[in-house]
């Protein structure tokens, strides 16, 4: 993918090369046809509206309050940008910051690009960066993302185009968290005038400008004609909510839409057999699991959690529900994330041990529980398989299916018994999994939907945050993840593989490892 940010130096170089080529062509006696000349001048086709069909609508569009991928996918690298960004290999590259250096272990200095404006005309500068992070870190803001940046002690404006982040302690994955959606820089004008409106009307510096949101129907973004970098080829992108799986694919085939960014595995054969559609597959950084609300009975008893962990046949879910798309997970961290360990041992499938544990917990005659899931087809199928499996130990499972936004609301309030869930990693670093999923400070909206609290686990997670030695960090993550499994907080199910369908008339898009749709270079034929 062509880098969309170019320095002035590179621009001058390209101009000189272009002049030399023109001179060489003028001196040549070889004739060229008009078609050849036209093809050299045309470049990527411009214009058109990209329609992306999705199962679920966004819940909010303020990056300081977004806690789900469907919402982040609307604004990340489209409306909003951060100081840095990950490339296709998840290596950090400059974005709004053109360069940076570590002055000492706890002071990071960023030199900012000049001449950039937010969509509302406000200038991008060091003060804008400070205002964004001051708002995020202010306890009064009550952002669920605050703890992810809690290592930042102060944001210091050095001059108009230089800003320093002063940390409480050395934090190795700082650039990775700055490259996430949570690190988006927000217009200071919008923050000052009406910060509450950012939930429905985002204002950033990105290649697309927010246009409209018809709740439950569609969100529209238009091309930023004043974008500071390489402008998008398309005029507009519309994210359209279409709950029915078959209808979304039919819209791709008929040309009503170009991308379906979440496709059930049962539709793979249909897509591959189509002459209008193509299949996009990529390994992601997400893990799917069954999680227990450990503050609610009967899951406040570890014996009950262990019993159910022993009674879920995970391999059968991978094969029967997912058709072997994705791989069996052994922990709440993808193998592609720094911190993963293949030494973590989940509970074996053992019905006799499960029954024994239930008897010890006082449930020899069985019990009734509710299993919550979102309305994704595979999640519902998984719930039905688990319901059937748990009958074998006398557990009567009621399945509760909710639209995605309502599902998120319920688990963030802790109103569920057990839930099928997933966690995507936006940084590629284990801290994003461990701190958000298991630290006591992250209970609720930040990500700890297990409502798990263990002082020893908290200490190990915090130690891994502060440790700069990679081998020591890996050892800490290995120890803490086995402890979480031993406490039976969740049952790991699947390492995620993202599947999308797209029209053969569209090119240039890709999905990054965090499952974000990247459309900077999209061309509609």
Regions found by a protein language model. Give the residues of each.
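Bilobed periplasmic-binding protein-like "clamshell/Venus-flytrap" ligand-binding domains
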Residues: 172-178, 204, 360-378, 415, ...
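Alpha-helical secondary-structure segments
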Residues: 51, 125-132, 160-166, 206-207, ...
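Periplasmic binding protein-like
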Residues: 52, 121, 388-439, 476
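Ligand-site clamp/hinge motif
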Residues: 224-270
């Amino acid at each position: 993918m062509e880098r969309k940010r170019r320095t002035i130096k590179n621009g001058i170089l390209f101009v000189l090369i272009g002049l030399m080529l023109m001179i060489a062509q003028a001196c040549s006696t070889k004739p060229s046809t008009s078609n050849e000349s036209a093809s050299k001048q045309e470049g990527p086709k411009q214009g058109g509206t990209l329609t992306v069909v999705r199962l679920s609508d966004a819940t909010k569009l303020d990056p300081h309050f977004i806690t789900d991928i469907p919402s982040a996918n609307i604004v990340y690298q489209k409306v909003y940008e951060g100081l840095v960004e990950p490339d296709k290999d998840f290596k950090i590259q400059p974005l709004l910051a053109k360069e940076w250096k570590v002055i000492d272990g706890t002071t990071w200095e960023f030199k900012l690009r000049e001449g950039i404006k937010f969509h509302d005309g406000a200038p991008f500068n060091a003060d804008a960066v400070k205002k964004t992070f001051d708002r995020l870190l202010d306890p009064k803001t009550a952002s669920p993302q605050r703890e992810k940046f809690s290592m930042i002690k102060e944001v210091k404006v050095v001059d108009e185009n230089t800003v320093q982040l002063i940390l409480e302690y050395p934090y190795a994955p700082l650039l990775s968290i700055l490259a996430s959606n949570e690190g988006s820089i927000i217009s200071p004008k919008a923050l000052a005038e009406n910060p509450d409106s950012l939930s429905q009307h985002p204002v950033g510096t990105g290649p697309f400008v927010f246009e409209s949101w018809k709740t439950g129907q569609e969100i529209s973004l238009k091309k930023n004609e004043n974008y500071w970098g390489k402008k998008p080829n398309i005029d507009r992108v519309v994210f359209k909510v279409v709950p029915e799986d078959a209808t979304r694919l039919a819209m791709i085939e008929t040309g009503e839409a170009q991308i379906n960014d979440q496709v059930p595995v049962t539709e793979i054969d249909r897509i591959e057999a189509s002459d209008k559609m193509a299949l996009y597959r990529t390994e992601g950084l997400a893990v799917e699991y069954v999680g227990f609300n450990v503050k609610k009975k009967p899951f406040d008893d570890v014996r009950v959690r262990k019993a159910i962990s022993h009674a879920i046949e995970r391999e059968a879910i991978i094969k029967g529900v997912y058709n072997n798309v994705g791989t069996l997970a052994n922990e709440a961290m993808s193998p592609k994330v720094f911190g993963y360990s293949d030494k973590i041992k989940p509970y074996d499938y053992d019905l006799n041990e499960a029954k024994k544990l239930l008897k010890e917990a006082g449930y020899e005659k069985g019990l009734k529980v509710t299993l919550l899931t979102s309305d994704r087809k595979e999640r519902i199928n998984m719930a039905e398989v688990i319901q059937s499996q748990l009958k074998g130990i006398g557990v009567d499972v009621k399945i509760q299916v909710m639209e995605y936004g309502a599902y998120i609301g319920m688990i963030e309030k802790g109103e569920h018994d057990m839930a099928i869930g997933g966690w995507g990693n936006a940084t590629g670093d284990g801290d994003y999994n461990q701190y958000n999923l298991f630290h006591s400070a992250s209970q609720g909206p930040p990500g700890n939907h297990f409502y798990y609290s263990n002082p020893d686990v908290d200490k190990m997670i915090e130690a891994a945050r502060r440790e700069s030695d990679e081998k020591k960090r890996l050892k800490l993550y290995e120890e803490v993840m086995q402890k979480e499994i031993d406490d039976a907080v969740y049952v790991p199910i699947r390492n995620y593989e993202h599947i999308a369908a797209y029209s053969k008339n569209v090119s240039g898009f890709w999905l990054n490892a965090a499952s974000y749709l990247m459309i900077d270079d999209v061309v509609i034929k």
